[in-house]
Amino acid sequence: MRKLFQADGNFTKLGRRTCTTLAGVYALAIVLLCFLPQTWYPQYKDFSTPGIIQIGRLYLLPTPFNSIVNGNKVDSLGDFGWIILQNVTNIFLLFPLVFLLLFLREEWRSLKAVLSYTFCFSLFIECTQLLLDLLIDAQRVFEVDDLWTNTLGGVLAYGLYRLIVKGWKV
């Protein structure tokens, strides 16, 4: 760890380069995960999340807390579990990137900044998915719940960052 961090918790040159590379690779993974057409991924089951509205080639899930509101409309407990798992993975979608950016970018190091930047990242992802649906029929879904779950992930990353920084100061 001494090769990556100085005694005060700041990065060494190698640490900064490593963190920047990891953030770039993870950002690329997010792009591939969020923007490739849905049909490129294996479909484990013919499953549709309840509450989705289709307008032409656009897929929207405008219901806040859809898992709770429409949870009674799924066919099985396993399908409900699949929906909950999707929400959990959305919480952690931006977590690693935000965590790395907190170390790299001083302007990110407040709760207000994390809330703003993470929400904007999430909104960009969702709007880009709509654009891709219009352009190439990617069958992506704009989900209101993704906005708050991704933002919550950013807040959790901020909490972990603060714990680590606090540990260095002890």
Please identify what each model-predicted range represents.
Residues 141-161:
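Alpha-helical transmembrane segments that form the membrane-embedded catalytic/substrate-binding core
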